[in-house]
Every structure is written in structure tokens, then in C-alpha cells.
Regions:
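Gram-negative/organellar outer-membrane beta-barrel architecture
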Residues: 34-42, 50-195, 199, 352, ...
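Flexible, surface-exposed loop regions and adjacent strand-edge segments
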Residues: 135-141, 185-193, 243-244, 267, ...
Length: 375
């Protein structure tokens, strides 16, 4: 839904009359609040991909919003909680390194007082990536080896709110069936054979908390979860392994115009883990999958300065580490940081959009952002 804002900007550029209808009556600035709150129906969504791991690319999505945020806010008078609108969508995209994918999914709430939530989707992918080895060591002297994943993946998650709290418990299922092909010109003995079909199927519990004041660009509160997935041949997979994640994103306002965001994020994997499912250091400025091992952890700070009622500047800095093949103290620490800007594109909803430039150990990366950069 958030990326649907991009298509609104495109329409506004070619239709002055329509652009005028997106003017905020309070300050006359460009604002999409009414469009997002009242919009129902199918919405085409152009996408721009800027992830360094796959290169620049683009695509097109189609989003359907079944109920408006205004209706959800009215329902909050009964339930005591503002439930996100039910959203369904589909997307096709491609990037400059030959990666292609198509996916469809959605999220919706149901049950008495909207106590239940569902999130899920299914996708077909043909993805080209690089593997740098556990702890950066392939075992053959090469810096990295290219590989391709071609197949299907899907995930389903159901969450139940605990009483009238901001806490949820749930169950999640992840299924992946890929033909995995390694670059035949650069053999990696530890990853042989060069081509194989590998199926992963995992089920596990989730404990989640969400007290953010805004699900898009929060200014106070925190969101976090404890997740575990247990993969096994007994539920349709080829290998037996486990993955774990614990994360917390906290937002603290101070001095009226500033918001400090704090992120702690740790992941682990045990057992016969496929190399492409190993945890990795996930921070802006570092390509996804560049630093992988059995364990990975990240700490990140982000400071937002609301310089005007509409415009904000941000600065961020993070550090991460992947370890397991080496002891924690011996593994390299990866640092990355950068700066960006935001525009309050939907004042009534608190949605910011903008761009970041980040520098990691090896390269500088550019990111488009709608809402929070943390997932």
C-alpha cells in the first residue's frame, strides 16, 4: 500500500487538476492523506528496486485495499485498537543482473474484535546472487561465487492478540522449493553438487509486541518479536535445521523536533542449513548476504530531525557481525552509516517518504524509502 504513493505522484505530475485535489487544506502542501484514507479498489503500483545485491531494477504491482483506514479508526472505538486495513496485492519485477520474480499475498484481520491477524504470500523467483562463504571463506581461494535460485516460495502466519494488550502469539509456516545452481566456472567444494533441487519446509511459533504510535513511520513506542522455525523432512523438507530471530525497534521522541530510533536484531541457524538461508548482516550500505554465518547480529541508531512540519533529515549508523565459523571475538565487525531526507507525504497518517545514501565497508548504496527502513 505504501508504494502506491509513487503512482499518485506520477498521476499528479500529468494532471494539474488532480494534483490540486491532493493539496492539504491546512498548509497547501502536497499530501496524500485523503487519498490513502478513503481509497478503495485496485491500485497500480510502479516499483523501483535499489538493492545492491541484485542491482537496479523495476516492476509493477497491483494492490487492493478492502477497507479504508477511516473505517478502521471508527472500529477502534469498539475494539480499543487501530487495526491495519486488509490489503491484498501482486507484483512482477526484474533487475539488471537478470533477477526476476512474481509474487502475490496479503494481510487481513478477522474474528471477534479483530483479534486474529493473517499475513502471507506466494512467489515465483529466478534470482541471481553471490555467496561469500561462511565467515567470508569459500574454501577455494575465491572471494565469492555466483549462484541462482529458481523456484517457488511461500509463507503463512496467523497471530492472536492476547486479551486487549499489544502482544500477540502466533504460528508461521515457510516453504521453499528451489533449483539451486552454482557458477560452474568457479567450483566451491563445500557447496557441491553444482546443481540440485532443495526443498525447505519449516513451522514455528512467534511472540510479538507492537506499541508503535504509527505502523508506517513511528515516533514513539516499540515493536519486536521472538521467532523460531523448525525445518524437517517430516513436514515436506529435505533437510533438518532451525532458524531463530529476536529483534526490537524502539522509537523515542525528544526536544520536540527529534526522534531517536534504536534497532537490535539477532538471528541464528542450526543444523543442515542451506547456504542461502544462513543469517547475514542486514544494514543499509551492505549488500544483503555479503556477510553470512551461523549467527548474525546488528545494532543500529537512526536520528530523525523534523526540520519543518513537512521535511525531515535523518542520520543513521549501524554495526553488525556474523560469526560461527569463527568465535564472536575473532569475527570482523562491519560498520555502515549514512544520511537521508524525508517528506511527510501523508500528514494525517504520519507517513514519510524519501531517500538514503549509505556507505559500507566496500561500497556506497542508494535506497528509496517509504515508511520505516526497518523490517
Amino acid at each position: 500500500m505504501l508504494r502506491g504513493l509513487l503512482v499518485v505522484l506520477t498521476i499528479s505530475a500529468v494532471s494539474p487538476a488532480l494534483a490540486q485535489s491532493f493539496s492539504d487544506p491546512e498548509d497547501g502542501a502536497l499530501d496524500m492523506s485523503e487519498f490513502i484514507i478513503d481509497y478503495k479498489g485496485f491500485l497500480p503500483v510502479p516499483l523501483l528496486i535499489t538493492e545492491p545485491a541484485v542491482g537496479y531494477g523495476g516492476g509493477l504491482g497491483l494492490m487492493f485495499v478492502r477497507n479504508s483506514l477511516r473505517e478502521r479508526r471508527q472500529e477502534a472505538g469498539t475494539s480499543g485498537h487501530v487495526t491495519p486495513p486488509d490489503v491484498f496485492g501482486a507484483v512482477v519485477a526484474a533487475t539488471e543482473n537478470g533477477t526476476k520474480f512474481a509474487a502475490a499475498g496479503g494481510m487481513f484481520s478477522f474474528g471477534d474484535r479483530e483479534q486474529w491477524r493473517y499475513r502471507g504470500g506466494i512467489g515465483r523467483a529466478d534470482v541471481n546472487l553471490d555467496f561469500y562463504g561462511r565467515g567470508g571463506d569459500l574454501g577455494n581461494g575465491d572471494r565469492s561465487i555466483g549462484f541462482n535460485l529458481d523456484g517457488w516460495a511461500m509463507t503463512h502466519q496467523a497471530l492472536l492478540r492476547l486479551a486487549d494488550s499489544a502482544d500477540f502469539i502466533g504460528l508461521r509456516w515457510v516453504y521453499m522449493d528451489f533449483l539451486v545452481t552454482l557458477d560452474p566456472t568457479r567450483p566451491a567444494p563445500a557447496l557441491a553438487p553444482l546443481t540440485r533441487t532443495l526443498t525447505s519446509s519449516g513451522i514455528g511459533p512467534t511472540l510479538e509486541h507492537d506499541s508503535r504510535d504509527n505502523i508506517f513511520t513511528p515516533s514513539r513506542g516499540w515493536q519486536g518479536s521472538l521467532d523460531a522455525l523448525f525445518y524437517s523432512p517430516e513436514i515436506g523438507g529435505d533437510e533438518k535445521f532451525q532458524t531463530y530471530r529476536a529483534h526490537a525497534f524502539a522509537y523515542t521522541p525528544f526536544a520536540q523536533a527529534f526522534v531517536l530510533g534504536t534497532r537490535l536484531d539477532a538471528r541464528a541457524a542450526r543444523g543442515e542449513v542451506p547456504f542461502y538461508q544462513l543469517p547475514f548482516v542486514d544494514v543499509r550500505g551492505v549488500p544483503k548476504g555479503r556477510y553470512q554465518d551461523n549467527n548474525a547480529a546488528v545494532a543500529e541508531l537512526e536520528l530523525r530531525w523534523n526540520a519543518t512540519p513537512r521535511w525531515a533529515l535523518i542520520g543513521f549508523f549501524g554495526a553488525g557481525k556474523a560469526w560461527g565459523s569463527e568465535k564472536f571475538g575473532d569475527a570482523n565487525t562491519v560498520f555502515a552509516g549514512g544520511a537521508g531526507f524525508r517528506y511527510l507525504i501523508a500528514r494525517r497518517l504520519g507517513i514519510y517518504m524519501g531517500a538514503d545514501v549509505a556507505r559500507g565497508p566496500e561500497e556506497t548504496a542508494f535506497y528509496l524509502q517509504v515508511g520505516s527502513a526497518w523490517r
